[in-house]
Amino acid sequence: VSQLNNRREVLHDEVIKIRGEKEIEKGNVEIELALQWSDAFSESIRCYTNIIRNKDGGTHLSGLRTALTSSVNSYAKKKKLLKGDALSGDDVREGLAAVVSVKHPDPSFSSQTKDKLVSSEVTGIVQTIVYDKLGEFFEENPSVAKQIVEKALLASKAREAARKARDLTRRKGVLEGGGLPGKLADCQSRDPSECEVYLVEGDSAGGSAKTGRDRRIQALSLIHI
């Protein structure tokens, strides 16, 4: 994890370490996890099964991602740090560096190269252990937990702002670049499903229409024929 966070500004000095095991029919499945958040905008997660690197992840990665999202959202709601919609997995994992290692008595892989773990029982095992242990860590380290939640909230706001900017650009492209002649008096709403575009001929008609229109949902395009 320290290597993954090299040249990054970490949010918390302590690397969070989680261990657990679950007995299955053929023996015990052991889980080890180390994770730390930084100011980076991407995630970096490495997965291993019986010391073999799984570059394509697999069921241990799926379980980890689900647990992280659930645990951070649960803590944020409990401490009233989350006022709007639940944080997405992408928001929670932004800036995360993690290494998850599984010891399995009889693992299954997607191919002979063992690039991806496909043992289905591992998903639930990892999910349960990580959710419980990470929740305990958050309760015992509230300052670290708050930093992680705040990082995710910032990521969520940034993603929403970027989405609105993309929607606005697309919308203007449709209205302005779709072959409508003349000038456009845009409306306030950014929801295409409720917006209307009126074609108005002539300056005098355009002036009257501007005065009488609902600026929130009605846009005008002034044309000259």
Which residues fall in each region the model found?
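GHKL-family ATPase ATP-binding module
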Residues: 1-222
